[in-house]
A protein has these predicted regions:
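Short clusters of hydrophobic/aromatic residues that line enzyme substrate/ligand-binding pockets
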Residues: 23, 106, 186, 223-225, ...
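Interfacial loop-to-helix transition and helix-capping segments at the boundaries
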Residues: 102, 230-232
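A short, charged helix-loop
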Residues: 236-266
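Short coil/turn motifs at beta-sheet boundaries
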Residues: 197, 233-235
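Glycine-rich flavin
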Residues: 45-224
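Alpha-helical interface subdomain recognition
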Residues: 1-98, 265-411
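Short secondary-structure junctions
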Residues: 169-172, 221-230, 246-252
Length: 411
């Protein structure tokens, strides 16, 4: 599958220009293809069966999505075998994976790991990702915070709390300079890494002087990936332990910090699109149900109290769409406003997804609380996604700091 950049998003936007947040024809075509695949290969019964069995990623589905549809290479330039598309197209796929609660490492490999590698220019790994031959994951906890808006996207302004400056739990030994490769031995444990179980390559930020980003073969001796209990069983987390494992350096110093910061920022922005997809699916399911469910000889959706609740959800979902689309447009254009747009989108979409999923469960009545109904999958996806890569309150606190407002309580 190939796609082309829309003329309104290619390159950096001129100062003051307003991006077109509408979906282009190419984006809608991409959506239709991805939705058809997920509806066919990952319907609710299949997802529920996978969760019941305690299985992690659906690798056959991921291979089809990554290699056959080319979604793994959307962000990768054509010179490395990718589609040369933008974050706008990547956001469309994220929306659909959220809508289906798909058990695929799209966010962690095709977005976060790819964004980090684009910052290093490693053609070999980028080519492997674009072809679908390799899957990668950034060895950072899924709760890691992207750079704050006042960092200017560098990742260097907040040290270990927010951004890419560290400290990181993996320590890098002195590189072996005998063959000029710079390979270093890595030791440490990273907790709660998303996408680690499916990854062939781990991108490991190594704390040291200088700070470096390393590529590690996930199958190498000394690498242990232990699944951990996660609220969202459709996106399994793992603790990754490295015991004297060789790591090939990809970037050093500020280049490495920028690569990791780019991965976290892109991940948060595309997770906002995924959360919007969850919210929109929950709203659609609920509206359909209250139209069909009758009580007192009339559809329950005709009751004013339910109308008001669903109207509130619709407003939240619509706002989340606008914020997520703006963040995707800023990422696509390399806009200086990207950190602000991503923080706004992550906060808005996280809240909207949780609200929509909660109302989906409650307004479905008794059936909404059963294991056989998919509402609980969407609720867990919504809640875990809202906590990943910065909670809504943490992102709002970062935005408040820009205008010297106090953060929300508890931040």
């Amino acid at each position: 599958m190939t796609t082309t950049k829309d003329s309104t998003t290619e390159g950096t936007r001129s100062a003051g220009a307003i991006p077109d947040l509408r979906y282009s024809e190419a984006e809608e075509q991409l959506r239709a293809v991805v939705r058809d695949l997920l509806d066919d290969r990952s319907p609710w019964p299949a997802v529920l069966a996978r969760v019941d069995a305690g299985e992690a990623d659906d690798l056959p589905l991921w291979h089809t999505l990554a290699a056959d549809l080319g979604c793994a290479g959307l962000l990768i330039p054509e010179s490395h075998g990718g589609a040369g598309a933008s974050y706008r197209e990547a956001a469309v796929v994220a929306e659909e994976t959220g809508r289906a609660a798909a058990c695929v490492p799209y966010l962690t490999s095709a977005v976060m790991a790819t964004a980090a590698l684009l910052g290093t220019g490693d053609g070999e790994l980028l080519g492997g990702l674009a072809s679908g031959r390799l899957t990668a994951a950034l060895a950072a906890g899924f709760g890691s915070l992207p750079p704050a808006p006042d960092d200017g996207g560098s990742g260097a302004g907040r040290g270990g709390e927010r951004g890419a400056g560290g400290p990181w739990p993996v320590r890098a030994g002195r590189p072996d300079e005998r063959d000029g490769s710079g390979v270093a031995r890595l030791n440490g444990t990273v907790r709660g890494v998303a996408g680690a179980l499916a990854a062939d390559v781990l991108l490991v930020p190594g704390d040291g002087v200088p700070f470096r980003l390393y590529a590690v073969d996930a199958a190498a001796a000394g690498v242990r990936r232990v699944p951990v209990v996660s609220l969202d069983a459709t996106r399994q987390l793992a603790d990754v332990t490295l015991d004297n494992v060789p790591g090939r350096p990809l970037a050093t110093g500020e280049d490495a910090a920028r690569a990791v910061a780019a991965a976290l920022t892109a991940g948060a922005g595309m997770l906002a699109s995924e959360q919007f997809g969850v919210a929109e699916r929950c709203l659609g399911m609920t509206v359909t149900y209250v139209k069909e469910r009758h009580q007192f000889a009339r559809p329950v959706g005709s009751f004013q109290a339910l109308k008001h609740r669903l109207a509130d959800v619709w407003v939240a979902v619509t706002q989340a769409r606008a914020a997520a689309r703006y963040a995707a447009a800023c990422l696509a254009a390399g806009d200086p406003d990207t950190p602000v747009a991503v923080a706004l989108a992550k906060a808005a979409a996280g809240d909207a997804a949780v609200l929509a999923a909660q109302e989906c469960v409650q307004l479905h009545g008794g059936i909404g609380f059963t294991w056989e109904h998919p509402a609980h999958l969407l609720l867990k996806r919504a809640k875990s996604g809202s906590m990943a890569l910065g909670t809504p309150d943490r992102h709002r606190a970062a935005l408040a700091a820009l205008v010297d407002l106090p953060p929300p309580p508890g931040n």
